[in-house]
């Protein structure tokens, strides 16, 4: 853990930060083995490097999806994005106001999803307990559409995802309506959910469909069929990746 901080941060601030880091390490069974602390002219910079190992036969990559595999996601999607929209709205509303607190009542779940995401270690443990080995997997950080297209490109496949099966929390739906945003777009392209996207052989359908916290949302197809979203009324739309790409050049 390497940290650069300015004079406006107190020793107590650093104690609180490391208390949170230690709590996360305990939760995920991780040891802090080193780091560096230095001064910064402005602001705060935190750089964390994580190193681990795994049995070779248990490592799952992006490139293993096969035709007819089932596409699965953990948790629900779009909540982190709506949490961000909520925070940005309150920032604008309260700009210049003093002694006024933002009203987040009833929206705590959305804020938690944006501000305190958690790695889905529990899903990995459930899959292992059920003896299910995914054929491909990655986390959903840049949006479901973007990650699906990554898996399909790496695996040389296409996919079909069904709108009616995409898991969305009630609070996410309410906020999308309040912001006049398309709910499916929020779920497909919002990003920062940090849920797991993975594929499993169709032979595991019965086992995975009964697992709490996992939703079957589609299947893998031949590459020539491309990647598409099937809407509730049966229309087919090509998937568009609108997720963040740090290597893309601005035009």
State where each predicted segment sits.
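Glycine-/charge-enriched secondary-structure boundary and capping motifs
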Residues: 8-33, 38-46, 51, 129, ...
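A generic local secondary-structure boundary/capping motif
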Residues: 22, 35-39, 56-64, 74, ...
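Polyanion-binding loop/helix "lid" in catalytic or ligand-binding cores
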Residues: 101-148
């Amino acid at each position: 853990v390497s940290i650069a901080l300015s004079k406006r941060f107190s020793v107590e601030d650093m104690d609180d930060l490391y208390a949170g880091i230690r709590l996360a390490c305990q939760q995920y069974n991780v040891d802090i083995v080193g780091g560096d602390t230095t001064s910064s002219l402005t602001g705060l910079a935190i750089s964390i490097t994580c190193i681990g190992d795994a049995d070779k036969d248990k490592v799952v990559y992006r490139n293993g999806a096969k035709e007819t595999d089932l596409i699965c996601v953990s948790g629900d999607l779009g909540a982190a994005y709506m949490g961000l929209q909520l925070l940005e709205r309150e920032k604008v509303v309260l700009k210049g106001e003093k002694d006024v607190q933002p009203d987040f009542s009833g929206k705590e779940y959305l804020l938690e999803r944006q501000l305190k995401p958690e790695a889905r270690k529990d899903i990995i443990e459930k899959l292992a307990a059920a003896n299910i080995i995914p054929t491909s997997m990655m986390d959903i950080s840049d949006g479901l559409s973007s990650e699906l297209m990554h898996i399909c490109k790496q695996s040389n496949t296409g996919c079909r995802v069904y709108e009616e099966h995409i898991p969305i929390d009630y609070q996410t739906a309410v906020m999308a309506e309040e912001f006049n945003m398309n709910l499916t777009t929020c779920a497909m392209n919002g990003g920062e959910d940090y849920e797991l996207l993975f594929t499993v052989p169709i032979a595991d359908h019965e086992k995975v469909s009964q697992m709490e916290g996992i939703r079957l949302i589609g299947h893998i197809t031949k590459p020539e069929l491309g990647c598409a979203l099937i809407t509730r009324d049966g229309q087919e739309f090509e998937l568009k990746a609108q997720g963040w790409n740090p290597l893309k050049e601005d035009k």
